[in-house]
Curated annotation (Swiss-Prot):
PROSITE patterns xref list: CSA_PPIASE_2, RRM, ZF_CCHC
Entry GO terms, CC: nucleus
Protein name listed in UniProt: Peptidyl-prolyl cis-trans isomerase CYP59
Keyword field contains ATP-binding: no
Residues annotated as domain PPIase cyclophilin-type: 1-161
Purpose of the protein: PPIases accelerate the folding of proteins. It catalyzes the cis-trans isomerization of proline imidic peptide bonds in oligopeptides. Influences somehow regulation of RNA pol II (CTD) phosphorylation. Binds RNA with preferences for GC-rich sequences. Probably involved in activities connecting transcription and pre-mRNA processing. Involved in brassinostroid response.
Length: 506
């Protein structure tokens, strides 16, 4: 009376005590025959104590006996078959994991060490492992969480009955599947934080070159995600355009038109931009050449590398910049967020930042003459005032001319002198205002420049920290993989030695 249990870590052969525990052995054999245990997890592994399985839900709270399937819900559990001569004295003892007195169903456990005598008299012992102690050792050494659930799932793959002394009930034939089920049981509670039983470490599955490539791809993706989060690129998966060349080592005197003329012999050049310092306007000695199609770009790449332009040997490569794509992305995003047009003038062919027009101003110049007051010469008006202002100004001018004609001193020399002095004072005031505006503008530019430099410095520091953290994570991953392989190698060597000793002892 034996059963072969195939697990994800190896095979186990169990000899059953069918003469002393007929109810339990019949229940176990018939559940194996209907493939009830296929896919069941070892949901509880307590090192040097027990390994429990037999629950299709994988929680330790489920499971039914064969008698429930044969006779109904009232027969879900059956009574204990405890014998004093069947003890937990040896490693590999097989017993029922009952929920209490006479509450046996489908769950059972293996003992993982000798002399667990305090379990005697509490659980039904119905078998003993005959072969597969190395598999039992692997189960015992599994890494588990604080609830004794293995981090990597250990499953029963198949069960094969080697000897069955009990006759099959008539209803059993209807319960037997046509083929042995594979995978997870339908009743299993989903748990996404576990490694599946067929998972293998990446360094064991891939070669050294493939593993390095995978790690490099992950690092590149992480960098792209960081750049996306800080706003340097529109999305992590963005790719640079394939029709743009990067040209460096240029002579500072080389102009955009020169590059446009030189590279035009390979195809239509859409743009040739020499990058310049935003303050001084001096060339930074590199440029971007955009072609109309990819073929022209590739031809220029092969022909122009190390070419001589203005006494300089230039270097040509495919552009990795996504600046233009990022600008287009932001422009589309701005249009999408603002109604596909300019909110200033209402036009749909441009956005607000490119608008040079706009609605009629709410502020207009009422009078340039400071003797009438008005501070800066601007007053608040309403919509209707904008169209009435010219007529109002003409009336004011006529009234002023009449007053001057009636005045006895209207054309006097003193009047003219006073007006000249007033004009000189106004011009001096305007020059001071212009200098003040220029000073404020210069200060604002300097402040913006400092802020831009601070942002670039912070971005470089963040990228450096991210790069260092990725390098440390990669080193930790390599170290953990090496440790894991070393532990597995030591464990396999120990299992081999123990198996040889056992065969020698027999």
């Amino acid at each position: 009376m034996s059963v072969l249990i195939v697990t994800s870590l190896g095979d186990i052969v169990i000899d059953l005590h069918s003469d002393k525990c007929p109810l339990t052995c019949k229940n176990f054999l018939k559940l194996c025959k209907i493939k009830y245990y296929n896919g069941c997890l070892f949901h509880t592994v307590q090192k040097d104590f027990t390994a429990q399985t037999g629950d299709p839900t994988g929680t330790g709270a489920g499971g039914d006996s064969i008698y429930k399937f044969l006779y109904g819900e009232q027969a879900r559990f059956y009574k204990d078959e405890i014998h004093l001569d069947l003890k937990h004295s040896k490693t590999g003892t097989v017993a029922m994991a009952s929920g209490g007195e006479n509450l046996n169903a489908s769950q059972f456990y293996f003992t993982l060490r000798d002399d667990l005598d305090y379990l005697d008299g509490k659980h039904t012992v119905f078998g003993q492992i005959a072969e597969g102690f190395d598999t039992l050792t692997r189960i015992n050494e599994a890494y588990v969480d604080p609830k004794n659930r293995p981090y990597k799932n250990i499953r029963i793959k198949h069960t094969h009955i080697l000897d069955d002394p009990f006759d099959d009930p008539p209803q059993l034939a209807e319960m037997m599947p046509d083929a042995s089920p594979e995978g997870k049981p339908k009743e299993e509670v989903k748990d996404d934080v576990r490694l599946e039983d067929d998972w293998v470490p990446m360094d064991e599955e891939l070669g050294a070159q493939e593993l390095e490539e995978v790690i490099r791809e992950k690092a590149a993706h992480s960098s792209a995600v960081v750049l996306e989060s800080i706003g340097d690129i529109p999305e992590a998966e963005v790719k640079p355009p394939d029709n743009v060349l990067f040209v460096c080592k240029l002579n500072p005197v080389t102009e955009d038109e020169d590059l446009h003329t030189i590279f035009s012999r390979f195809g239509t050049v859409v743009s040739a931009d020499v990058i310049r310092d935003f303050k001084t306007g001096d060339s930074l000695c590199y440029a971007f050449i955009e072609f109309e199609n990819k073929e022209s770009c590739e031809q220029a790449y092969f022909k122009m590398d190390n070419a001589l332009i203005d006494d300089r040997r230039i270097h040509v490569d495919f552009s990795q910049s996504v600046s233009k794509l990022w600008s287009q992305f932001r422009q589309k995003d701005s249009q999408k967020g603002k109604g596909n047009g300019c909110f200033k003038c209402g036009s749909t062919d441009h956005i607000a930042k490119d608008c040079v027009g706009g609605p009629s101003s709410k502020f207009i110049v009422k009078d340039q003459n400071r003797q009438h007051g008005g501070g800066e010469g601007y007053e608040m008006v309403f919509e209707g005032d904008v169209h009435e202002t010219p007529k109002h100004n003409s009336h004011e001018r006529e009234r002023s001319e009449k007053i001057q004609r009636r005045s006895p001193h209207g054309n006097g020399e003193g009047k003219r002198q006073h007006r000249d002095e007033r004009d000189d004072g106004r011009r001096q005031h305007d020059r001071e205002d212009a200098r003040e505006l220029e000073r404020k503008h210069r200060e604002r530019k300097e402040r913006e420049s400092r802020e831009d430099e601070d942002r670039r410095r912070r971005r470089r520091r963040e990228e450096s920290r991210d790069k260092e953290s990725r390098r440390e994570r990669d080193e930790d991953d390599h170290r953990s993989h090496r440790d894991y392989k070393e532990r597995r190698r030591e464990r396999d060597d120990r299992h081999g030695r123990e198996a040889r000793h056992e065969r020698r002892d027999r």
